[in-house]
Amino acid sequence: MSEGAVTLHLPGADLPRVGDPLITDVVAGGLATIDPALPGASAQAAASLGMETGAHQLLLILVDGLGYELIEEYVGHTPTLRRVRGDVRSIHTVVPSTTAAAITAFGTGERPGATNMVGFSVAYGGGVMNLLAMEGGPAPCEWQPVPTYFERLAAADVASAVVSPARFAGSGLTGAALRGARHVPAETLDERVSAALRELRAGTPVVYLYWSEIDHAGHGSGVGSDSWIANLEEFDAGLARLLRSLPAGVRTVMTADHGMINVDASQIVDVASTPALREGVRIVAGETRAVHVHADAGRADEVEARWRDVLGESAWIVSGEAISALIGAGDGAAVIGDFLVLARGRGGVVDSRTQSASAIAMPGVHGSLTSTEMRIPVVVLS
């Protein structure tokens, strides 16, 4: 089991307690259901997540952005998930509750402090680097040094496959989180379902199926929008088809990387147009709900004090050793910078000097410590 308990006092934050399972435990538990001797397998994780042993193959389904509370709220649109509603467990993702951090935690079993995957973007080379792409940055295996579960399986001559669109094959995130698995390109949900079934029927021991479209719809149109609901319903229908066609002996586990909330545009603060936040700040990175602040040399305490004064109860601000308490031990805290700003309520912080207008205008976002963002589902489907 991962050591993910957080002892910080952050009123209103939904953080894991000692012994609570995390996203870092999902693959370890799943592997134990097919062979507890596999590299990275954990019988303890399997037991904590309700995963029974005795399977011959493992199918891991990760639905980007479909947090536990969203499944509960929109269960009327998901007849397939509604049938297993009582079996869906609520566990925690990592901090920050965002794709780059969480999928890498899923793929390695380690929290962001160890993987350096600490947000959507990070300060790098005098600018800001997007961790999903890592364009112009180091090789993913250099930035993120922790071996993935898939690398460890490959070293033991156990094959694995990742089913996702072709555009993800060479991405920074794929290299950081999923390296070691063979990439199987498939575009639509039907194509991905068919590809996953082919891999299972061919005997591939571990198959990972990724669905990003619900998250994309949330970013573009908001949670609960027509587009978001259409994508949710499409996924549920595809899941039904997949489950009807599974070969015998497959353990199927579905989870997500994080949840999502709709922000209130009137509560978004722009660093570029707020002198008290802008002064003394070298670089702002991260994302709207989980902001990395890098102060000018020698000004960190002064800058943090001003940010606390300006933002007040609209954000949790964490600095020093407290950052590692949130994200896990390792070099990730240094990557975040002088302090981390995690939005409360439905607000956030942006910087129009480095962020595009479309990114700033996203109605659906994530990254912070609310239960809607932090709670993710785990359900054993077969």
Language-model segments: what does each one mean?
Residues M1-S382:
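Feature captures the catalytic ectodomains and active-site-proximal regions of enzymes
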